[in-house]
From Swiss-Prot:
It comes from the Archaea. This is RNA-free ribonuclease P. Keywords: Endonuclease, Hydrolase, Nuclease, tRNA processing. It is an enzyme of class 3 (hydrolase). The lineage of its organism: Archaea, Methanobacteriati, Methanobacteriota, Methanomada group, Methanococci. Its EC number is 3.1.26.5.
Amino acid sequence: MQKQRFCLDTTAITDSDVRKSLGVSNISESAEKIMDIIAQARVQLDISCHIPYDTVYKELVGFLTREGCAPETLIKVDTWLVKKTPNRYEIKIPAEIFYEYIKDLRERINKGMRISENAMYETALEAYILSKPDEKDREDVLNEVLSKTVNSFRVKYRNALRGGTLDSAPDLDVLLLAKELDAAVVANDEGIEKWAQRLGLRFVNARDFPFILQEYLDLWDKK
């Protein structure tokens, strides 16, 4: 049987869906539970869980530290997650993937520009409507209109440019390391999932990951 390897994104440990699936209320509890299952799977079944170093590793440790996780949990992260830097100079990626990525990025930039233009038109129109009836104070009009428009713009712009694509070095490192090791990608990130599929990589949703490992362990215990 081929050795099972998993490559973890930060969301594999920190995502809110993971906490819900485990029935816990905070990251400290969910991180400790997941790390205990990973440890058992490593010792009993030789299943290895990898994390890109230092991009994703630093991101994960920083997040857990800010959330007040116990030092013991951070020690488990260091002990049971295999830290490795992807061999970025040797991993071969088909040129078609780069073509698709650039095309996707260009479409997103154009969409973001259209959203920006619409936001400016909406701001001007609302400012005119609000100021006309009773000649409101100029600053009040600007504050009222801009706060509303900017908040709406941020949401739309973020979704247009970042939703469903790779938008950070850690995201890319997860895919590169998974390809190098022939490992399954574990994440709760639409962009990582989309590009994992395009690269022909196995993908496991973060909320399902602990239960998959537990299923392996339960079956082993029945032997």
